[in-house]
Amino acid sequence: RAMALASPLSPAAWLDDIFASKAAIRGQVIRRKARDIEKFVGRREFERELKRRGFQAVENAGQVIIFCNREPIRRIV
């Protein structure tokens, strides 16, 4: 897995940084570009971290919405 030159953070530090955001700490949702996740940390490692934290995520149109809590997700429409 090659690390992109665009991020000064290691993959672990990048993950720590997004999950240290106010929204994540409060159990809210955060959004990231799918390509940034793949570029900075890798899909497999990202999914492993979500599972470790008990979080869920959905992807649509190149965006990943991360639910920073363990509540069920209910699709409305």
Per-segment meaning from a language model:
Residues 1-29:
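An N-terminal amphipathic alpha-helical segment
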Residues 5-9, 72-77:
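Long, compositionally biased
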Residues 25-26, 30-33, 75-76:
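A short, structure-level motif marking secondary-structure boundaries and short turns
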Residues 30-35, 63-67:
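Generic recognition of long tandem-repeat/solenoid scaffolds
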Residues 44-76:
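Short, compact, well-ordered microdomains
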